[in-house]
Amino acid sequence: MIIDTTEVQAINSFSRLESLKEVYGIIWVLIPIFTPVLGITIGVLVIVWLEREISAGIQQRIGPEYAGPLGILQALADGTKLLFKENLLPSRGDTRLFSIGPSIAVISILLSYLVIPFGYRLVLADLSIGVFLWIAISSIAPVGLLMSGYGSNNKYSFLGGLRAAAQSISYEIPLTLCVLSISLLSNSSSTVDIVEAQSKYGFWGWNLWRQPIGFLVFLISSLAECERLPFDLPEAEEELVAGYQTEYSGIKFGLFYVASYLNLLVSSLFVTVLYLGGWNLSIPYIPVPELFDITKRGRVFGTIIGIFITLAKTYLFLFIPIATRWTLPRLRMDQLLNLGWKFLLPISLGNLLLTTSSQLLSL
């Protein structure tokens, strides 16, 4: 059987076409995976740079300025330095718990990004229990911190892990009650539905105005969950050296460093989604869709505008936790627990009862 030249060329072109299809298929699988990872990484780098610049302004000094333009690559330089440092293990500690702890803390926080809507219908997992899934996942992170403290075989590390667990339990309940109030107002636990419920009434329909008490409780509780000053008792330098991070070095210490900023970004994004209208701008007396001509330019342009609005609100809100770090003194452990159990818990419970009563009366 003789095959002429044209048939050989056709077979070769067909095989090349099949190879290209396989390559494109792999690329389309990898794009949804690496795009959120890249976005989250850039978001964390921006937060670190913002914190250093704002902190420098508050303290009247010059922030980072040599690594990249305006020092924006300083966080990347610090991460590279940690990556090449020696990874030390405690001689008498539990090495398995010591190694698993940072990974649990980071993974549990990363999973929270699944239910955050960055734009109209732009969410990785639009679940009917979105906000409560976030609360359930975020409660896993202190387990990793406790494992790290216990596995270090160090009294300072163990005390830091215990403080992290006690602090998380104390402030998780008021946080959950505030989220439950928002869920009752929106008649849904989906993050997308909560944003759309606020969009119906414009700027004055934001839950910030409908739930001012809940917003304050949520703000304080989220600061405590992120272990930011004045609630950074699990890693208080003057008392516990570095808390549960004392024995860590290299990439494992870097994971804790990244986890703290990931948690801060998640909390700010949920404040934006639950209280600040999410991707909806709604400036009073300014018709935003007509201003940007979203309806005529198509859905892609509207999605880009929604992402920009969500991130702008998030980074503007980040000024509050960054400023409180250099403004308020650290609480004592008894003051922290009293604030959570004796003040925030009754206030959040009363807010939930008021919200439930108003919803029942409006039926």
Swiss-Prot record:
It is a multi-pass membrane protein. This is NAD(P)H-quinone oxidoreductase subunit 1, chloroplastic. One of its GO terms (molecular function) is quinone binding. Pfam families: NADHdh. InterPro entries: NADH_UbQ_OxRdtase_su1/FPO (IPR001694), NADH_UbQ_OxRdtase_su1_CS (IPR018086). It is an enzyme of class 7 (translocase). The keyword Metal-binding does not apply. Belongs to the complex I subunit 1 family. Coiled coil: none annotated. It is found in: Plastid, Chloroplast thylakoid membrane. It comes from Helianthus annuus. Keywords: Chloroplast, Membrane, NAD, NADP, Plastid, Plastoquinone, Quinone, Thylakoid, Translocase, Transmembrane, Transmembrane helix.
